[in-house]
């Protein structure tokens, strides 16, 4: 397994990895948009796979990704994305709230607070809402899982979002973050 030059250096600490997660996830989700389908096809397919994993949509080959917009640290929410999908001519809108955890546990009822902010912002008749916690931990502590379940969040270790045992994409940035050990 190759080691990531992007995510690991000689520092004793790795800086603020959660901020890096916000930026890379934002970029990854936006690269799933159909406007990038021919530019770097392997990268596009990988980004689609990640987006549909977070949306919990299987059998997505027929779905077109019309647009993806992302916001980092909106109302203290790590990342949120608006996605417009075209399923056989029917436009469907999805919004994802993503909380990432590298070091710290969920605290101060934050998942429920963020969910409430999100739900007050979106009209449920127009948007399908998704709540996701992504952690860099290989094993998610049971207390974190319980808090996610209680708040209606799906939870994933980073390697469950996308396995690093894939062929290289056409993007060094993607490869360094998603396909290297760090």
Where are these regions (language model features)?
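Charged, terminal alpha-helix-loop-beta segments
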Residues: 1-182
